[in-house]
Every structure is written in C-alpha cells, then in structure tokens.
C-alpha cells in the first residue's frame, strides 16, 4: 500500500560537470554512498541516479525517501527542487513527510481504529486523536533494503521493506517494493 509521488515530467536537457561522464556513456549511472546512521546504529545509504541527459535524483534508504531532484531552470541551469534536508540527523529529529514513502496507509485513520473481517484494530496515535501516514514508526522511518537495477528506460533503484504483523497495530505482514527510475526522457517514475 505504499504511496509514492511519481510521474514527474521534466522538460529540457542540461548537464553539469559531475553528470558529463554519465551522458557520454549514454545510459546513465547510479552512485551509492553513506548518508549516516539511525539512532539505533543502522546504516543509511544514498543512491544518486543520473540519466543520460545529466538529470539527477537522490533517494535514501531511510523511508525510501526522495531527497534531491535536479532539474533545469529557464536558463538550463540544474537546481534541486525537492524540499528536504542535507543530512540524516535532520530527518531523524522529525520531518513533515518530505519526499517519503508513506504507509501502510497514507492520510488519517479516525481515532486510530478500524474494523477488518469483524475484528477491531487499534493503531498508533500520532496525530491526536488520529493515526497519520502509518503511525509513530511508520515505513517512512524504517531503513529499506536497496538494489540497483537498470532498464532501457534509465537508471533505477528498487527499495524493499517488510512490515511485520502488528507493526504500528496493523494486522498481517506486508512486503513492499518501490522502484525509482530516472528515465532518459527526463521523468522520475
């Protein structure tokens, strides 16, 4: 049930020095680097996708979160258009859901309760008196696994996370997968 903002269509083509090599290869690239550690010591990584035109997107394994998207302005100069932070610590101290994958449910569940198959479930309350975007420790606050993949469309990274039975009060385990692809047509999907 993970929601991801997708289908961002970008116009124009520009490059910056760090993207020139990827453009020459005509297929794009994915760069992995350390982004910090959670309070319980889990390593968080950043994956930067660069397409053949030099467009860039960065996604971190914490919340499968989009933290950067570089697109050209009217003069062809690339700039980051994503609201967010430059470091993990700022996300760990609380964030307004910038660029995250939310779930198990996006939006509010009134009073943190729902009935499924005749049984009432009580969820974590994090938007008094409601449950919002998966709860206090929702999937936006989990470290996801990541795997680099490539397709004809452009460079991609697949993120996966399994929410165990009972996490934040939800019944059943749920396997989730989110794939970010930066197409060579300058779309992030």
Task: Report each predicted region and the residues it spans.
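Boundary at the C-terminal end of the N-terminal hydrophobic targeting segment
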Residues: 11-13, 17-21
């Amino acid at each position: 049930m993970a929601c991801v903002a997708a289908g961002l269509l970008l116009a124009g083509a520009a490059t910056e020095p760090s993207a020139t090599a990827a453009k020459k290869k005509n297929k794009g690239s994915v760069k992995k680097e350390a982004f910090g550690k959670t309070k319980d010591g889990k390593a968080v990584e950043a994956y930067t996708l660069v397409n053949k035109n030099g467009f860039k997107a960065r996604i971190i394994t914490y919340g499968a979160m989009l933290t950067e998207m570089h697109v050209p302005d009217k003069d062809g100069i690339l700039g980051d258009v994503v609201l967010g932070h430059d470091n993990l610590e700022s996300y760990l101290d609380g964030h307004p859901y910038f660029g995250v994958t939310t779930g198990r449910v996006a939006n509010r569940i009134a009073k943190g309760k729902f009935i499924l198959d005749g049984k009432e479930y009580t969820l974590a309350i994090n938007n008094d008196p409601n449950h919002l975007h998966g709860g206090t420790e929702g999937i936006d606050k989990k470290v996801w696994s990541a795997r680099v993949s490539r397709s004809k469309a452009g460079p991609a990274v697949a993120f996966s996370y399994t929410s165990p039975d009972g996490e934040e009060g939800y019944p059943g385990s749920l396997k989730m997968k989110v794939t970010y692809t930066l197409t060579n047509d300058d779309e992030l999907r």
